[in-house]
């Protein structure tokens, strides 16, 4: 099995709204954390939540952290789509897929997937309708099924694991609507005993 797995997310769009806030850790380190919701089209029909957990002002070498500075501008200016529509601030974010592990009220472990933000930059180009929220990741797939949907057409669902930078196994399931993609996984017939390691995007 590979030692380095791909797991990348790229998002461009308008700052729709956010819960970003300046905070201080118990050890006295200033940082910014919270959720930045990004509208990936001019009509804000698709909004992607991006989670920034711990963004500090400088890197280990002492250089300023441009992502911290940009998130600070978003907090200070609050130039959001909710307030200003399509004239709102635009951003470009790179990150990865991660799982938010927690215990439910019933005592069961839940691991919903989410986007973890790594770097954020101002975006000056127009926001296109297609291609503003993309991901590519290696995935160890243990199952595939076709789901019937009379309203929107049948779709496929794969379940398995993606990997973070520590190569931890992160359980995820993904929806597939592309017919060729559905055909590929149906023919591959991945199972727990005979999984499929492949790249998905």
Label for each model-derived stretch:
Residues 1-201:
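OB-fold and OB-like single-stranded nucleic-acid-recognition modules
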């Amino acid at each position: 099995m590979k030692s380095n797995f791909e797991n990348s997310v790229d998002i461009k769009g308008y700052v729709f709204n956010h819960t970003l806030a300046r905070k201080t850790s118990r050890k006295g380190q200033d940082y910014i954390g919270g959720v930045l919701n990004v509208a990936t089209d001019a009509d804000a029909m698709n909004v992607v939540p991006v989670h920034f957990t711990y963004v500090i002002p400088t890197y280990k070498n002492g250089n300023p952290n441009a992502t911290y500075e940009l998130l600070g501008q978003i907090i200070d200016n609050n130039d959001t789509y909710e307030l200003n529509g399509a004239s709102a601030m635009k951003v470009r974010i790179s990150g990865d897929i991660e799982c938010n592990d927690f215990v439910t009220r019933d005592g069961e472990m839940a691991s919903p997937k989410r986007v973890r933000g790594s770097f954020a930059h101002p975006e000056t180009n127009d926001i296109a309708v297609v291609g503003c929220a993309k991901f590519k990741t290696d995935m160890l797939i243990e199952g595939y099924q076709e789901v019937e949907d009379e309203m929107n057409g049948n779709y496929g669902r794969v379940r398995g694991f993606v990997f973070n930078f520590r190569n931890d196994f992160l359980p995820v399931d993904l929806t597939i609507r592309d017919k060729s993609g559905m055909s590929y996984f149906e023919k591959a017939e991945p199972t727990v005993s005979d999984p499929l390691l492949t790249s998905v995007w």
